[in-house]
Amino acid sequence: WFAQGQYTRPQSLQYGGDTLQQGPKMILDWLKKNLNNTKKVFGIDLHTGLGKSGYDTILVPDDIKEDKYNILVSLFGDHVSPLDPTQGVGYRITGDIHSGIVKEFSSIEWLTITQEFGTFGPTTVFKNLRAENRWTQNNQLTNEKDIMNHWSRKNLLNTFNPNNKRWQQDLISRGNTVFKSVQEYLSKLD
C-alpha cells in the first residue's frame, strides 16, 4: 500500500529520510520541554487523504488493548477502525509518530489515535503523489520558489487539503467534535 512511509529507497514515493526529520524533531523538543510532570496524554494525529471524502476515521493500532479500544468506541462510535487494510481505510505500519513518542516518554500513560479525513479516491491520490515525486526527483531548477510552485506540488496540496469549503467545514466541525470529546473524557479522569 503506497500510503505507508518507507526508508530504503530515497527516490521512491513516501521516502521518510534516513534521520529524524525537522517536523518530528520539533514536536519531540516541544514535548520534552512541556511534559515534565504529565502523567496521562491523549494524542490526536490529524491526517488527510484516506477514505470517503469528508468522513473521518479514527485509526488505532492493531495491538491496542481491549479496554482502550472500548474507550475509543464509546467516544467515537463506528468511526473507530484498526490500522488493518482488511477492516477499513487503514494500512499496516511499522513504527509511526505515536510509537516513537510513546517510547520516548515511557513514564506517561498514552492513548493515541490518528484522525484520518478522506479527500479523493486512491487513484487520484496515487496519481498526484507520483507526479509530485517525479517532479521532485527530476527537475533541473535551482530557484526554490520555482520548484515549490510547480503544478504537481499545487495538485498534491489540493489532494490533501481540497479547495472545497464544504470539505473544510466538515474537517473543522468533526475535528472540534473529536477534540471536545477527548477534553470531556480527560476531565472525568481527574
Where in the sequence are the language-model features?
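C-terminal accessory segments enriched in acidic
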Residues: 1-190
